[in-house]
């Protein structure tokens, strides 16, 4: 994958998203980030993928003990049953790998709990198999800040590209003239974009007011 230039950016038609182990057990020992932030961000990321019709794979690990996928995330794809694994490394589960290969897409976008294990393992393995791996660092987290940081450094050294969920959204949209997705993304940003979402909603309000103002 080129490191610079337009082709280095994410494209919705080339992307596939895999969301790994956003479950109660993992959240219980998440200490690198505020858990509510990760919940917000991963749901925002999932909704963004849905706006752009980016195939999304949901997967859990031993949900009988670790709990089901968090409800807000499952609600984005109510018809999809998460792939429940025994493998710690998602990329060793043939069902996940087969689904990715079947999509034909090479930009692999990953988010997981925890970063040092369930994000790092599949990221490093998929890189060796020729995928362009993008790790969504603010929709992932580790058991400590150091664990998350060391995991990100390790994956970057291996060739992964660190991104935030808003960066993913921006690269998929690229141009606000793309009306097919602009309105849907605007709704996601207003709900999950934090201060950026508030500012965006305010901008939309001002634009609407200008359009409705009678000519002088």
Task: Indicate where each model-derived feature is located.
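Active-site beta-loop-alpha junctions enriched in small/polar residues
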Residues: 61-62, 88, 138-140, 168
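Glycine-rich phosphate-binding loop at the start of an alpha helix
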Residues: 43, 94, 116-120
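Glycine-rich oxoanion-binding loops at beta->alpha junctions
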Residues: 82-104
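A contiguous pocket-lining binding segment that forms or flanks enzyme active sites
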Residues: 107-165
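A short acidic, amphipathic alpha-helical/loop segment
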Residues: 69-72, 95, 121-125
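Short, surface-exposed connector motifs at secondary-structure boundaries
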Residues: 49-56, 78-81, 102-108, 131-136
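Active-site acidic carboxylates
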Residues: 1-87, 149-156, 160-162, 173-216
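A short acidic, often aromatic-flanked loop/helix-cap motif at beta-alpha or helix-coil junctions
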Residues: 88-92, 167-174
């Amino acid at each position: 994958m080129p490191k610079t230039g337009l082709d280095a950016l994410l494209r919705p038609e080339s992307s596939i998203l895999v969301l790994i182990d956003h479950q109660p057990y993992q959240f219980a020992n998440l200490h690198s980030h505020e858990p509510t932030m990760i919940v917000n961000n991963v749901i925002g990321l999932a909704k963004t993928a849905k706006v752009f019709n980016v195939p999304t794979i949901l997967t859990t690990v031993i949900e009988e003990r670790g709990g089901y996928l968090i409800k807000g995330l499952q609600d984005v794809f109510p018809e999809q049953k998460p792939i429940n694994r025994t493998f710690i490394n998602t990329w060793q589960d043939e069902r996940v790998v087969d689904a990715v290969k079947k999509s034909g897409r090479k930009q692999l976008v990953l988010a997981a709990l925890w970063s040092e294990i369930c994000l790092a393992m599949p990221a490093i393995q998929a890189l060796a198999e020729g995928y362009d791996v993008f790790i969504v660092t603010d929709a992932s987290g580790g058991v400590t800040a150091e664990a998350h940081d060391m995991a990100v450094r390790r994956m970057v050294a291996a060739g992964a590209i660190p991104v935030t969920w808003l960066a993913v959204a921006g690269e998929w949209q690229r141009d606000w003239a793309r009306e097919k997705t602009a309105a849907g993304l605007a709704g996601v940003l207003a709900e999950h974009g934090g201060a950026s979402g508030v500012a965006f909603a305010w901008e939309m309000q001002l634009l609407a007011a200008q359009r409705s103002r009678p000519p002088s």
